[in-house]
């Protein structure tokens, strides 16, 4: 039910409305798409082909493209950018998109379309061209107007009124370096359509509440309500409180990386703006603690539920706790109650603040993993750990695996648990033992050959953190997860690509979400990492 709401909204953002198209526009549109010039796109594609070892093949293909310095490509100007803009509406059939094609020679382009594509073109006295398309297509005709060196193309003639066109010089005035970009302005949704969408959300919410009543399991019912209301709240925020969405693709040959950026710009002083600002100010002891040198993997999450979500979260936690106690064997009920009492304050806080890191392998090929989780009332959590140990020792008879309160490091108490990990873990970590460090506000764990990593990390302090992040060394990942190549083969290919200095800082795959004035998501990969993966795939087809 909730998913279906996104279908008309997505269609709305892409195709638009003829009615709303009648409003004069001079500089911006509700939806804007920009592509770099054909020459630039071919240059970026050449770089990408080089990353995957196919540059020679690609250049052979490019040589077959008939680009003329004066006539362009079949009359299209290959030196200037391409654009598309439109409006927002639920009336998909009346799409108000306008395509901007740069033209080097209009007659050459018209001749190509008529001779090669078989399109019939009629020029009218008002400057509009009617392009008749083959039958049985999605539309019978297109309409075009040539001005300022660009051919404006639309499905409806009314969209090409000369007074309402966005001048190409205004549309392409800013060059941010993106290969492709999409701008969506939800604040330009027409009032009538906004009311329709909000009414659909209210209707869906009522339907969710009715469906929730049919769930006999309390935990399932609470989870159903929380998930449904979360999606509806996000949808409502997009309609009411988001000003602009920017999606941009960057391909940077000089800095050797590719990235996809999404920026959400809120309405000033809106609840969403305040939430974004709060996310931008968050610090994390867990994130600071896992900041170690030589990491091949590092990630974190750090956010708190909004006030309107916390009540539903509490209901879900209470339902899960009640169900867990109901299903536990009678002989374990007292112990499980004590365990849940220690976990409950952290869960009720409705804060997700955790981080993890993994160092590069040592000479024996073993990794060390370090993780940290923010907790509430850590002393109660320590009591829960003791109860878990009692259950473990009672059920297994092993009274030597767990060693509590081994040492104190600052505010932390160290514990060691032997033989807790599966036998296969020893291949990668060199051990099956787990180290724990507990304090009033943090739970830290470490496993691997570098026992000093945990002790040294405990002296780190809190630091500003992103909402979500994941940094992965692609070479490090290949050493760990590639089943078709030995570590020696991986190292040889890494040396081939990066030289003796190694891949450090040049093979990263990164995902980061940050708050602040806007909410920004960036997914990027360094060129060296792509070259390495391509070479590894070629060596092990």
Roles of regions detected by a PLM:
Residues 366-374, 442:
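Ordered core of a single globular domain
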Residues 1-5:
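Positively charged n-region of N-terminal signal peptides that target proteins for export
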Residues 132-211, 428-508:
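A conserved glycine-rich beta-strand in the N-terminal activation segment of trypsin-fold
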Residues 71-76, 103-146, 380-434, 467-497:
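Short Gly/Thr-rich strand-loop-strand
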Residues 22-138, 173-244, 259, 263-365, ...:
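Structural boundary/hinge residues at secondary-structure and domain interfaces
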Residues 102-107, 156-160, 375-379, 448-451:
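Helix N-cap motif at beta-to-alpha junctions
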Residues 17-21:
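Sec/Tat signal peptide C-region and signal peptidase I cleavage site
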Residues 6-16:
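Bacterial N-terminal signal peptides
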């Amino acid at each position: 039910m909730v998913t279906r709401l996104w279908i008309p909204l997505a269609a709305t953002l892409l195709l638009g409305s003829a009615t709303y198209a009648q409003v004069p526009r001079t500089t911006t549109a509700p939806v804007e798409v920009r592509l770099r010039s054909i020459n630039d796109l071919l240059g970026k594609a050449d770089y990408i082909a080089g990353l995957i070892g196919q540059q020679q093949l690609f250049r052979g293909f490019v040589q077959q493209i008939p680009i003329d310095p004066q006539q362009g490509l079949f009359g299209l100007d290959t030196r200037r950018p391409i654009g598309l803009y439109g409006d927002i509406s639920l009336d998909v059939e009346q799409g108000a998109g306008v395509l901007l094609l740069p033209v080097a020679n209009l007659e050459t382009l018209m001749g190509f379309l008529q001779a090669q594509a078989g399109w019939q073109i009629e020029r009218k006295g008002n400057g509009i061209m009617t392009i008749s398309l083959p039958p049985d297509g999605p539309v019978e005709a297109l309409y075009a107007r040539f001005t300022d060196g660009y051919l404006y193309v639309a499905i409806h003639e009314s969209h090409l009124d000369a007074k309402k066109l966005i001048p190409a010089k205004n549309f392409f005035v800013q060059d941010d370096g993106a290969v492709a970009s999409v701008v969506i302005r939800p604040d330009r949704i027409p009032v009538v359509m906004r009311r329709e969408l909000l009414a659909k959300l209210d209707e869906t919410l009522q339907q969710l509440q009715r469906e929730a009543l049919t769930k006999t399991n309390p935990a399932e019912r609470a989870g159903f309500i929380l998930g449904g209301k979360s999606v509806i709240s996000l949808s409502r925020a997009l309609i009411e409180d988001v000003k602009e969405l920017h999606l941009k693709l960057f391909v940077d040959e000089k800095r050797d990386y590719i990235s996809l950026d999404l920026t959400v710009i809120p309405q000033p002083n809106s609840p969403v703006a305040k939430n974004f600002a709060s996310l931008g100010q968050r610090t994390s002891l867990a994130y600071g603690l896992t900041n170690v040198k030589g990491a091949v993997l590092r990630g974190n999450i750090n956010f708190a539920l909004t006030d309107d979500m916390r009540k539903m979260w509490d209901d879900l936690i209470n339902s899960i706790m009640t169900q867990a106690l109901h299903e536990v064997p009678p002989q374990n009920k007292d112990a499980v109650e004590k365990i849940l009492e220690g976990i409950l304050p952290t869960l009720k806080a409705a804060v997700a603040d955790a981080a993890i890191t993994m160092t590069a392998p040592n000479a024996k090929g073993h990794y060390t993993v370090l993780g940290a989780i923010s907790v509430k009332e850590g002393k109660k959590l320590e009591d829960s750990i003791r109860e878990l140990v009692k259950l473990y020792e009672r059920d297994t008879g092993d009274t030597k695996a767990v060693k509590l309160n081994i040492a104190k490091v600052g505010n932390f108490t160290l514990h060691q648990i032997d033989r807790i990990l599966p036998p296969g873990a020893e291949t990668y970590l060199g051990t099956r033992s787990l180290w724990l460090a507990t304090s009033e506000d943090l739970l830290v764990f470490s496993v691997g050959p570098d026992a000093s990593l945990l002790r040294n990390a405990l002296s780190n302090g809190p630091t500003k953190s992103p909402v979500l992040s994941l940094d992965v060394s692609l070479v490090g990942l290949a050493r760990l997860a590639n089943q078709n190549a030995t570590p020696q083969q991986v190292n040889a290919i890494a040396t081939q690509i990066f030289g003796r200095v190694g891949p450090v800082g040049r093979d990263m795959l990164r995902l980061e979400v940050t708050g602040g004035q806007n909410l920004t998501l960036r997914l990027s990969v360094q060129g060296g990492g792509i070259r390495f993966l391509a070479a590894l795939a070629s060596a092990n087809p």
